[in-house]
Design a protein with these regions (language model features):
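Conserved DEDDh/DEDDy metal-dependent 3′-5′ exonuclease domain
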Residues: 80, 84-95, 138-142, 147-149, ...
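C-terminal extensions
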Residues: 238, 248-325, 362-443, 453, ...
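Short conserved beta-strand segments at catalytic cores or DNA/RNA-binding microdomains
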Residues: 143-147, 437-449
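Long, low-complexity intrinsically disordered regions
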Residues: 135-139, 153, 157-159, 172-175, ...
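Metal-dependent nuclease catalytic cores that hydrolyze phosphodiester bonds in DNA/RNA
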Residues: 1-114, 123-153
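A short acidic-Thr-Gly-centered motif at the start of a beta-strand
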Residues: 103, 151-152, 409-418, 475
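Short, C-terminally biased terminal segments at protein or domain edges
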Residues: 108-130, 324-379, 386-389
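Acidic, Mg2+-coordinating catalytic module of metal-dependent nucleases/exonucleases
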Residues: 198-201, 207-252, 258, 538, ...
């Protein structure tokens, strides 16, 4: 049995992913998205940036031949090389056996397979758990750093350091550092006194091995038992963690086939564990559950139990339900850190809205997702440019749909404003450049029954200020029109740009008061039979289709980067088309919610 640092990292994030990486059918893997490939390149570039200031040597060996890699690394260590990049450390007696093993390399052990001869031997872990199989542990720290101290090599020894794009020393990084240190101890005959993470902006960060070693051994034991016993973990869909995984389609299909509770918004892993102890394991049993009894458990605080039960009822009936009045009032004005207690919020991290849009993209970086691909890119010397995938439209797009031929009379709605003229606003951004390059506005004139889309596009970063001014001019062309948007990114960006470009308060503060967050309105007033309260699932449930079916916010990040490199204007057209559809989808959701609330009142 082969256990690599990559596999252990996957196991910490998702047990099922580690199982499928080892035992799954690789033909079922999703191809990596353009966004994931972009993250890989970004991670490679960051490692190159760090290594520019280091003098290092690297072991060379046939790809996937860990034994050859370990021998080459050992030779460099015996020579006393100061820095060794991507050395191979193996815990086991080389040459005892030479069974063919499949090693997972590439995109965090997802997309490529190599066959390498890896020797195996029984590994005696620092735990009481017996293992029947022969086990080989393979570690590939980003750097082995020489330091004073006796070892089998002489009066020097080594410590490990991993380069992460993240700003935070996350626990899974620290566990991997402890794994490196454990195997390094057997190679050099001395237990390392420390292990290091090299973090963006923070630099070197020391891992407390005394604290992390016991945790590492416990995690390692569980991982070995899972693979040894072929004990496939239960599927669980967690949108934040699953979206970029190569097994997403496989796992989601399995979850759909059994109507798994993790597909319900609000059913987190902790809550699902509690529900299982109560023998509530399907949608019907949750829909019939007593929410007052659920509320006695700490996993269901602050009326969450009621909302989760109602969510199951909505799915069972396949119809929307009115959220309880008291719950809506309690949530009004509450600023959330992360996700709502009910998790009826955008479930991703690429944007705060559809597919997640984060102001801090570094929290979703390629070092976390693909910790091993960067060395493959560095070894190839030249980074191959990412090709635009098939979801970039080549043929002319279908015309934008004309929505709502019979608009709701302004006087009928007392729940959500229906104005003679309404503005629907959506932004596209390039987070790494801190650039908001597209302000899309759909102007809906209900009186004249017209709809017109305005796309204020910056073809380079230098034009951001100009499109900001153009956008403001349009807002003041309709001085009392409400401005509808989905999630709070538009509000945050509006404030940021006003400050950045020293906009007088009288030009932007009155406009800010006209913003209405449709996402907030939906999540506070309705419960819908959707998997996520992001824009796409809601609008699609209502029958709206994007003209570019596979386009999303992450793809737009890739498209804009490709535009800057190629100057291909068809790329800009695809971005603007997607942005317009986002505005129109927001329009659909807003009109539906107004009608829904009106019907509930009647």
């Amino acid at each position: 049995m082969l256990i690599t640092d990559k596999l252990l990292l996957s196991y910490q994030r998702c047990n099922l992913r580690a199982f499928l990486d080892t035992c799954g059918d690789w033909k079922q893997l999703d191809p990596p998205s353009d966004f994931l490939l972009k993250l890989m390149r970004d991670s490679a570039a960051y490692q190159q940036q760090v290594l520019e200031h280091e003098t290092y040597q690297q072991p060379y060996y046939p790809r996937g031949d860990w034994e050859a890699g370990a021998i080459a690394t050992l030779s460099l260590m015996q020579q006393g090389v100061d820095r060794i990049y991507r050395g191979v450390l193996i815990q086991g007696e080389l040459g005892q056996t030479n069974d063919k093993l499949t090693s997972l390399v590439g995109i965090d052990g997802q997309y490529f397979s190599d066959m390498g001869e890896v020797s195996q031997t029984n590994i005696h872990l620092s735990s009481s758990t017996p293992h029947s199989s022969n086990i080989t542990l393979v570690s590939r720290p980003h750097l082995l750093i020489k330091q004073p101290g006796q070892s089998k090599f002489g009066d020097w020894s080594y410590v490990t350091a991993d380069i992460w794009l993240s700003k935070r020393p996350k626990l899974d990084y620290q566990i991997i550092a402890a794994f490196h240190a454990r195997i390094l101890a057997t190679v050099q005959g001395k237990i390392p006194e420390s292990a290091w993470l090299m973090l963006r902006k923070k630099g070197f960060w020391e891992v407390n091995l005394d604290q992390r070693n016991p945790q590492m051994f416990e995690i390692l034991d569980r991982c070995i038992q899972m693979i040894e016993n072929l004990d496939k973990p239960e599927v669980f869909i967690s949108r934040q963690k699953c979206n970029l995984c190569g097994w997403y389609t496989t796992c989601h299909g399995e979850a759909e086939s059994i109507k798994h509770l993790s597909l319900l918004p609000g059913v987190t892993a902790g809550r699902y564990a509690r529900l299982k102890t109560l023998e509530i394991t399907d949608v019907e049993s949750l829909a019939n559950a007593n929410s007052e009894l659920l509320a006695d458990y700490p996993e269901f605080p602050d009326r969450v139990a009621f909302d989760v039960v109602r969510q199951a009822q909505s799915h069972l009936l396949n119809q929307p339900l009115l959220r309880e009045e008291g719950r809506r009032k309690k949530e009004e004005g509450r600023r959330e850190e992360g996700r709502h207690d009910t998790d009826f919020d955008t479930d991703t991290r690429i944007k705060d809205r559809e597919e997640g849009r984060s102001e801090n993209l570094e929290e979703l970086n390629s070092s976390e997702i693909v910790p091993d691909i960067v060395d493959n890119i560095l070894n190839d010397i030249a980074v191959e440019e990412v090709k635009i995938r098939e979801n970039k439209p080549a043929a002319p797009a279908k015309p934008a749909p004309i929505l709502r031929s019979k608009p709701i009379p302004y006087s009928q709605s007392v729940f959500l404003s229906v104005a003679p003229i309404e503005l629907y606003f959506d932004i596209e951004a390039e987070p790494e450049m801190n650039l908001d390059y597209l302000h899309g506005v759909l102007v809906v004139d209900r009186y004249n029954k017209t709809e017109k889309f305005h796309g204020f596009l910056a073809e380079s970063a230098a034009e951001e200020g100009a499109i900001w001014e153009q956008f403001l001019e349009l807002m003041w062309a309709y001085p009392i029109a409400p401005i509808f948007h989905f999630c709070d990114y538009e509000v945050k960006t509006f404030k940021r740009l006003a400050k950045l470009y020293h906009t007088p308060a009288y030009l932007w503060k009155p406009v800010l008061k006209r913003f209405v967050d449709i996402h907030k309105q939906v999540t506070q007033q309705a419960i819908m039979p959707v998997e996520s309260y992001a824009l796409k699932p809601i609008a699609r449930w209502l029958g709206f289709d994007w003209r570019d079916a596979k386009a999303n916010g992450a793809q737009c990040v890739c498209w804009y980067d490709d535009w800057l490199k190629t100057g291909d204007r068809s790329i800009l057209e695809a971005i603007v088309r997607y942005n317009e559809d986002d505005c129109r989808a927001t329009y659909v959701v807003k009109d539906w919610l107004t009608n829904f609330l009106l019907n509930q009142k009647q």
